[in-house]
């Protein structure tokens, strides 16, 4: 009888340990730095993901859209910021430039992840925004030089 109770407790502990070791879903954060720029200035769009070693994460690729007013300047490689046990903290940065004035609603950052046979989309909780302002050119306070 004692042997059966001991075996049951051992199996219960093994099941609890296996459940605790099961991979947690990845988490995602994103930010825009700076969030307010002048026309033609560059800004950094950063996505960070904390994931398990067995999970695969695909970061978005930005295509050319001349009507968007935002242009991709450089897509930097994925950085591994830290590794704690089975968890990896990854960062993907994009350098972008804005060529239209206004407030841009960039929406929620997204990344695809695969865990075993499951493919899903990760989305941030907050929506990102970028404010692009123009600079004033005051031609009345300066005399225009005419070489004629």
Residue ranges and their predicted role:
Residues 1-9:
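Bacterial N-terminal signal peptides that target proteins for export
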Residues 8-18:
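Bacterial N-terminal signal peptides
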């Amino acid at each position: 009888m004692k042997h059966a109770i001991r075996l049951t407790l051992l199996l219960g502990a093994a099941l609890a340990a296996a459940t605790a070791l099961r991979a947690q879903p990845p988490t995602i954060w994103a930010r825009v730095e700076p969030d307010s720029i002048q026309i033609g200035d560059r800004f950094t769009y950063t996505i960070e993901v904390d994931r398990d070693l067995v999970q695969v994460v695909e970061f978005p690729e930005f295509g050319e859209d001349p009507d968007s007013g935002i242009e991709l300047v450089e897509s930097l490689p994925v950085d591994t910021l830290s590794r704690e046990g089975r968890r990896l903290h990854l960062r993907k940065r994009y350098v972008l430039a804005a060529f239209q004035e206004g407030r841009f609603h960039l929406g929620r950052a997204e990344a695809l992840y695969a865990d075993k046979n499951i493919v899903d989309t990760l989305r941030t909780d907050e929506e990102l925004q970028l404010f692009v302002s123009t600079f004033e050119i005051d031609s009345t306070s300066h005399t225009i030089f005419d070489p004629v």
